[in-house]
Amino acid sequence: MIEEVKLVIGMAVLQYGNLRIDPNQRRVYVHEQVGELTTMEFNILYYLALHPGWTFTREQLYRYAMPDDFASGLESVTSRIYKIRKKLNINAIQTVHGYGYRFEK
């Protein structure tokens, strides 16, 4: 469950414990420290966090997070999930074996 949602210029700032995701500034904070993510990493994290508990396939995440002209494959989603976990040191993104990923508190 989202602990706090603030509407700023129409986009929700999400807060889950020590993790805050601000789509307006395109920033992620962990323990109030800025986490550096690429655009695609941010898009994946925000989309998953916006729908906690929902499970998405790699294809669904790819279509949401990747620009239309990005010619990478679905494996790029797996790679970016790994990088998000490593950069932010969070366990909120769960792997659903044989299907995809979901965000859990």
Where are these regions (language model features)?
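DNA-binding patch around the recognition helix
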Residues: 10-13, 36, 79-81, 85-105
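A cytosolic small-molecule/anion-sensing beta-strand core signal
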Residues: 23-24, 97
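Conserved hydrophobic "DFG−1" position in protein kinase catalytic cores
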Residues: 21-23, 30, 103-105
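A structural signal for short hydrophobic beta-strand segments in well-ordered beta-sheet cores
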Residues: 19-21, 93
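Basic, amphipathic DNA-recognition helix from helix-turn-helix-like DNA-binding domains
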Residues: 1-16
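Positively charged, aromatic-enriched patches within helix-turn-helix-type DNA-binding elements
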Residues: 27-39, 43-80, 86, 91
